[in-house]
């Protein structure tokens, strides 16, 4: 047993915290950086969703690589990549440069996350201590994501948008030597199977498909867009075929033949996607439409993210008491009702009502994520628990990335249709960030007219998308109720 095991836990939690904070901190900074970099609507979406998309494809292979060459080594490399990418992101001078930096952050995160969990399990040999350590990891995970918007708001109140990335650097400078000193080295298992080619196929397929979807919504189905979509979907189909035919796949898709696992993965995908997509769009409405400062926007969003963090632990107790089927389906139904009610609410005049609705939404999605985990892990055979966990973590990250894409392209598409360009300025109907940039540059009464028209169009788009997503989640609630009809009361995982 490691004598310094609790210090090792502190070290890996320090390494883990920036990763989870980075999942939400950028939402608050998007309006500021979009204007500063002159980012288009599609570029804004890439800045946000490239991070979880890269993570979704690399989490499993990076975990396997760490098994092969040692967790300490991969963790240190991941921390170095994360720190360097944070510097590159903070000082990016263009949207494409920031997108590349965010992709590098995703690579660093995909190296850090599996090592953190593996080191906890390796360091704490006593079952009771390991459970305590994993509980601390869970709290840090939820709290980090919850405080992200607030931390972002505080930083942007005093510094420029790059500060939300630069804040990672001093943490890395402390964590790297601490990990080097405290975490013991290990030789790893050279027999562990590592298949980087499959990961590259998955990441390339995801990026090309998402690019095609975004381009198609913005400019229509051109030849270039159609070819991109065809290649992207083809790569994803190829990846799926490899997984099904392989004796040792990167992701065991055969688990999806079990209805509870399939619907659980769908819940993880939808819940994480809805939370991420809604946070992004809400942050833009609060700052662009309602003229709130980043700090005010962060405080406004706090009920949502805190309730989501609380929903997970409470969801396990609810599932044990009332059964997985009832809790899973009702959490999705509550989320759908909350989204629909928010779409009808005035965020200014009904601020307190909206705050309550945000609590309901966040709590419901948090419970839904925990219920999805119980459905997946509780239905997987014991010998495939690791494969089920890999499928769940990939689905969670993929849901976050694609949720942002879906929310973003729908909002931008409806915004373009609803926008009445009073001055006929170029580009202002593409996205609200481009419209607000143009309004500031033009100034005067013309600039004011553009800003007013953009705000009205975005508010309409936001409300319409919330109704669409609410309807989708309501259908999922019914599907969950049907698919989990034989699910017993389950212990939380």
At which residue positions do the language-model features occur?
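Intrinsic disorder in cytosolic terminal tails and internal cytosolic loops
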Residues: 1-2, 444-453, 483-493
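12-transmembrane solute porter fold
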Residues: 5-21, 26-28, 37, 41, ...
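Structural signature of transmembrane alpha-helices in multi-pass secondary transporters
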Residues: 19, 48-51, 55, 106, ...
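Interfacial helix-cap and linker-helix signal at transmembrane-aqueous boundaries
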Residues: 33-34, 65-66, 151-159, 213, ...
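Central cavity-lining transmembrane alpha-helices of secondary-active solute carriers
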Residues: 49-63, 113-117, 302-314
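Small-residue-rich packing faces within the transmembrane alpha-helices of Major Facilitator Superfamily
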Residues: 56, 83-84, 169-176, 236, ...
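Helix-loop-helix hairpins in multi-pass membrane proteins, especially solute transporters
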Residues: 64-197, 348
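Hydrophobic transmembrane-helix bundles of small-molecule transporters
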Residues: 135, 157-269, 274, 281, ...
């Amino acid at each position: 047993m490691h004598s310094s095991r609790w210090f090792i836990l502190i070290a890996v939690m320090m390494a883990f915290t920036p990763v989870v904070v980075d999942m939400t901190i950028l939402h608050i900074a998007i309006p500021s950086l979009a204007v500063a970099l002159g980012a288009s609507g599609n570029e804004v979406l890439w800045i946000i969703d490239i991070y979880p998309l890269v993570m979704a494809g690399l989490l499993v292979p990076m975990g396997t690589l760490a098994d092969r060459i040692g967790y300490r080594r991969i963790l240190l490399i991941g921390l170095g990549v994360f720190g360097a990418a944070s510097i590159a992101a903070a000082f990016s001078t263009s949207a494409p440069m920031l997108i590349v930096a965010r992709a590098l952050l995703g690579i660093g995160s995909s190296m850090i996350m599996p090592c953190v969990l593996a080191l906890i399990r390796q360091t704490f040999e006593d079952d009771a201590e390991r459970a305590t350590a994993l509980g601390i990891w869970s709290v840090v995970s939820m709290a980090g994501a919850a405080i992200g918007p607030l931390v972002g708001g505080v930083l942007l109140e005093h510094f420029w948008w790059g500060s939300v990335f630069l804040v990672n650097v001093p943490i890395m400078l402390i964590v790297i030597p601490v990990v080097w000193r405290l975490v013991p080295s290990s030789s790893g298992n050279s027999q562990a199977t590592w298949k980087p080619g499959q990961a590259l196929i998955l990441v390339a397929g995801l990026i090309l498909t998402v690019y095609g979807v975004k381009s198609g919504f913005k400019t229509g189905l051109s030849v270039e867009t159609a070819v991109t979509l065809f290649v992207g979907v083809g790569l994803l189909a190829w990846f799926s075929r490899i997984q099904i035919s392989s004796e040792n796949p990167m992701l065991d898709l055969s688990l999806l033949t079990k209805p509870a696992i399939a619907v659980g993965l769908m819940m993880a995908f939808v819940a994480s996607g809805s939370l991420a997509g809604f946070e992004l769009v809400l942050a833009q409405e609060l700052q662009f439409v309602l003229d709130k400062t980043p700090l005010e926007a962060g405080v406004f969003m706090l009920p949502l993210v805190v309730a989501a963090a609380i929903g997970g632990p409470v969801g396990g107790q609810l599932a044990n008491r009332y059964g997985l089927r009832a809790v899973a389906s009702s959490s999705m139904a509550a989320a759908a009702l909350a989204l629909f009610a928010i779409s009808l609410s005035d965020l200014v005049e009904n601020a307190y009502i909206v705050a309550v609705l945000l609590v309901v939404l966040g709590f419901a999605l948090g419970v839904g994520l925990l219920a999805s985990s119980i459905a997946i892990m509780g239905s997987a055979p014991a010998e495939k628990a690791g494969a089920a966990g890999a499928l769940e973590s990939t689905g969670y990250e993929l849901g976050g990335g694609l949720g942002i894409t879906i929310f973003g392209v729908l909002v931008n598409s409806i915004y373009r249709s609803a926008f009445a360009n009073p001055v006929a300025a170029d580009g202002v109907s593409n996205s609200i960030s481009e419209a607000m940039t143009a309004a500031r540059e033009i100034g005067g009464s013309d600039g004011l007219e553009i800003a007013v028209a953009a705000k009205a169009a975005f508010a309409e788009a936001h409300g319409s998308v919330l109704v669409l997503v609410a309807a989708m989640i309501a259908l999922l609630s019914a599907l969950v109720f049907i698919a989990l009809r034989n699910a017993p009361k389950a212990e939380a995982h």
